[in-house]
Amino acid sequence: MDQLLEYSKCFMQGVAVGIKRLACFVGVLVLFVSASQAQQKGQYIPGQQGLNAGIMPSPGITYVNMTLDYSADRFNNASGNATPLTGSYDIWAIENIFYYVPKFKFLGGKLGVMIAAPIVANGSLTLGAIEFPNAALNAGGFGIADTWVQPFTLGWSTKRIDTYVAYAFVAPTGRYTPGASDNVGSGYWGNDVMNGTTIYLTKNKGTTANLFTNWETHGVKTTGFGSVLTPGNAVTIEWGLGQALPLKKDLSQLLQLGVIGYDQWQVSNNSGFITPLLPANLVPHYSVHAIGFQTTYVLPARGINFFFKWEKEYQAIARPQGRTIAFGGSITFPKPEPPPAP
């Protein structure tokens, strides 16, 4: 009888622990879903710049095709610690980018306009828990994403530095239905003010230090709970240190290698409500930091280059933590004019 009572006691304690764990998992899951409604990331996806961050295209039309692949299997809380969730968060996007740079100068620099035509994007989210595999959240979607329009870019070039300032806005052209699980777009407008700088550390411009900054502000979005909110502003910094190596003596082929990284922070509170009773400013600010490498193959005379970038996130707060891969190429028409002889 005593053994039976002891067994019953242990069984009830196990049930209580299980209930607590389930309640904890549900709480974290609800918090994650609420946070996603508050847009726990910037509209700008970091990992796109790296080396040559301050160099504008040569006069003419430049086409860039870039594939972005972000994957994460860890979800961090406001302290930067992993939550008891398992699963994955994946984004695959193909950007078709068009630059136009006229030949005339403005304020001593080059003018440029750019548009990232509706991006083909595919995203998926699968959340669960090791202890409760049947309690899970699944979402995902494929389609045309938001459009990045950059109507103003002004850049200057000297012997030791290339730099530009730019303004862009994000048009919510991607599919977005409040509360839907297959959204591709963000559901709101955004504004971005940017600066890119490349410093040549050597006279032959082979060694470079690069820095890109982006300040983004956000418009109002409608949540799946019928309320409206404004995601907090975000700041993104991308950096890189690179070295160009000639593959041929005539410099017709170059290989560029370097260390790159990115940092992104939410710098102001969300405003509005996630639900009619849950203020959006209760969601903690997010941040993420990554480091990796870039390699670029350049054919200067043809205006062609191919690039590959890989960056691993080593810290994330209140958002997923994973890695970013970007690869693709660009071509300029007409072919760039050869640089003047030194």
Language model region names:
Residues 39-40, 53-60, 103-112, 156-163, ...:
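Short loop/turn motifs that connect adjacent beta-strands in outer-membrane beta-barrel proteins
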Residues 40-42, 70-93, 128-140, 182:
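Surface-exposed strand-loop-strand hairpins of Gram-negative outer-membrane beta-barrel proteins
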Residues 53, 65, 96-102, 149-154, ...:
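Residues on the lipid-exposed face of transmembrane beta-strands in outer-membrane beta-barrel proteins
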Residues 61-71, 113-121, 165-171, 209-217, ...:
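Transmembrane beta-barrel strands of outer-membrane/channel proteins
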Residues 73-81, 124-133, 165-166, 175-183, ...:
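Outer-membrane beta-barrel translocator domains and adjoining extracellular loop/strand segments
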Residues 88-95, 138-148, 185-191, 229-237, ...:
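Residues that define the transmembrane beta-barrel architecture of outer-membrane proteins
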Residues 89-157:
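Long, hydrophobic/aromatic-enriched structural stretches that serve as scaffold segments
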Residues 223-342:
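Outer membrane beta-barrel transmembrane domains
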